[in-house]
Regions:
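Active-site neighborhood of glycoside hydrolase catalytic domains
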Residues: 22-67
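C-terminal extensions
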Residues: 33-38, 56, 62, 87-97, ...
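Extended glycan-interaction surfaces of carbohydrate-active proteins
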Residues: 1-20, 61-148, 169-192, 217, ...
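Well-ordered alpha-helical scaffold segments within catalytic/enzyme domains
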Residues: 26-45, 95-108, 152-164, 211-220
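Solenoid-repeat scaffolds in large eukaryotic assemblies
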Residues: 49, 56, 110-111, 166-167
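Aromatic- and histidine-enriched alpha-helix N-cap/loop-to-helix transition segments
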Residues: 19-30, 88-93, 145-153, 162, ...
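Non-catalytic C-terminal accessory modules of carbohydrate-active enzymes
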Residues: 156-290
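Conserved aromatic-histidine-acidic binding/catalytic patches
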Residues: 16, 20-23, 44, 48-51, ...
Length: 290
């Protein structure tokens, strides 16, 4: 699918991607899957559903075969034959979409390798955030800038791979931003940590909570209910999350230790899964396995 720039920005043509930037491919593939799901749920246009699934699968297979550069340890922001692929150039939104398990792009090994690349790539990750464009030397509100919402999926990937060091770093980047600025800015300067653009943004406040819900607690919403797969660094070993609404239920979630192997208790009953039909107020305890 022709796309001259990543979803990270809407101002510049990214010539090194040869007209086929990575992140839009992933979003469009999942758009087709979502449209198919709507058709199936409503039991309407079922022929269209098949067509949508085929299109989504084709795009996703192309991403897997054309953008993964094993030598550079990344999903490049352009396909095979592009400058981005040859040099192993990547950007944050493509990286996030590739490693976020819900988008079904990377396998376990690729996810681990790419997370390691993100951690070790020069000019990619510091105490202030993830640089949207680690390979660009200029500075504007896209280049050498961190945008708060766009690393949540990397936090989820860190949870899946049990990478507490990375998960901890990603969360504390956001804690720092909030404590220092006392509001939710969108753009943070990668070099200085100065939050300089668009304060008070509700979707970045939501993303801040998402680091805890989906990164730390490993929550995922399924048709049948709610899954919780915690990965808890020591600093969060006694955290409470109160008044969390899930459909017709309200949860008080309490963490009782650290690690990535937990038993889940709802009102003192051990469970692997919280059913979608649950109602009322409930206490959810996350207890390390012994």
């Amino acid at each position: 699918m022709h796309a001259e720039h990543s979803v990270a920005q809407d101002a510049f043509t990214e010539k090194h991607n040869s007209g086929y930037s990575l992140s839009p491919q992933i979003y469009y593939a999942n758009m087709y899957f979502a449209m198919a799901e709507i058709c199936d749920t409503l039991q309407k246009d079922l022929k269209k559903s098949i067509e949508f699934k085929q299109k989504g699968t084709t795009i996703l297979n192309n991403v897997k075969s054309q953008y993964w550069n094993a030598e550079k340890g990344c999903f490049a922001s352009g396909p095979r034959g592009s400058e981005a692929y040859e040099k192993g150039i990547w950007e944050a939104t493509g990286a996030e979409a590739c490693v976020w398990p819900k988008f079904h792009v990377s396998d376990h090994q690729q996810r681990q390798i790419f997370l390691q690349t993100i951690k070790t790539q020069k000019n990619a990750l510091n105490d202030f955030g993830l640089n949207w464009y680690p390979f660009e030397e200029g500075k504007n509100h896209f280049w050498n800038t961190c945008w708060v919402s766009w690393t949540e999926g990397i936090a989820v990937a860190a949870n899946h791979e049990g990478d507490m060091e990375l998960l901890r770093k990603l969360i504390f980047q956001q804690v720092r931003n909030v404590v220092v600025n006392k509001t939710f800015h969108e753009a943070v300067d990668y070099s200085t940590g100065r939050a300089w653009r668009w304060p008070g943004l509700t979707w970045h406040a939501s993303a801040f909570l998402g680091y805890f819900m989906f990164g730390l607690l490993g929550m995922s919403y399924e048709k049948e209910g709610l899954l919780i797969s915690p990965c808890i660094p020591q600093e969060f070993s006694h955290m409470k999350l109160c008044n969390l609404r899930y459909r017709d239920a309200v949860f008080e979630i309490e963490i009782c230790g650290s690690g990535n192997q937990f038993d889940i208790y709802v009102d003192d009953s051990k469970t692997e899964f919280i059913d979608v039909a649950i109602k009322g107020r409930h206490r959810v305890m996350l207890c390390p396995k012994h």
